[in-house]
């Protein structure tokens, strides 16, 4: 039985809020040359096989001041106290938070946000970090059951997968595939001990 999903305005508004923060960012789908691995034998005829697709960085014209002004405008519209400064970390230039109550379709909303960011700016690489294996499996299921629904709306499908250190071909496809890609990973994978966990940070012959 196929599930039917209704379009909810508050979910669309949440996705639009994220998109509006970056208004002025051009639509681009840049490529780069992927790492061929230390065992690769150079062959000038197969460069295309090593083409990767990445998200275009935020253009310099969108300064922190402009981003904060956009964020504050959205916060005021939604009756949220405006932030005095942007939240950021060493690994994340902009930390934008959308708070939603349980059971109102948070996963649906951020999948829709991915589609909207791709539609407006060409961004196609997304990593979803979840706090537990149980939630990870639930997110994966949500991608499955909403796939046809979003494909009908946007005319394309997200390629999604669960990170597994023993299936590195999935990571390779994540980089080399030009469509929208989402990697689902639980936070413990970054903090775990052992050989498999360390593979996240290793340079491997396969690449």
PLM region spans:
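RecA-like P-loop NTPase motor core of helicase/translocase proteins
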Residues: 1-207
């Amino acid at each position: 039985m196929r599930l039917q999903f209704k379009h909810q305005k508050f979910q669309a508004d949440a996705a639009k809020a994220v998109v509006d923060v970056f208004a002025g960012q051009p639509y681009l789908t840049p490529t780069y040359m992927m790492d061929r691995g230390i065992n690769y034998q150079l062959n000038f005829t197969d460069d295309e096989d090593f083409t990767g697709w990445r998200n275009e960085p935020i253009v310099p014209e969108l300064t922190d001041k402009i981003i904060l002004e956009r964020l504050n405008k959205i916060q005021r519209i939604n009756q949220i106290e405006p932030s005095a400064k942007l939240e950021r970390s060493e690994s994340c230039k902009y930390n934008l938070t959308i708070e939603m109550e349980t059971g109102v379709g948070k996963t649906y909303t951020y999948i829709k946000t991915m589609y909207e960011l791709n539609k407006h700016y060409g961004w196609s690489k997304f990593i979803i970090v979840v706090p537990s294996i149980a939630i990870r499996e639930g997110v994966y299921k949500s991608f499955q059951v909403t796939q046809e629904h979003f494909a009908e709306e946007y005319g394309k499908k997200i390629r999604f997968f669960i990170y597994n250190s023993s299936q590195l071909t999935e990571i390779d496809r994540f980089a080399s595939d030009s469509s929208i890609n989402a990697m689902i990973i639980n936070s413990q994978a970054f903090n775990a001990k052992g050989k498999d966990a360390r593979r996240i940070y290793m340079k491997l012959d396969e690449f």
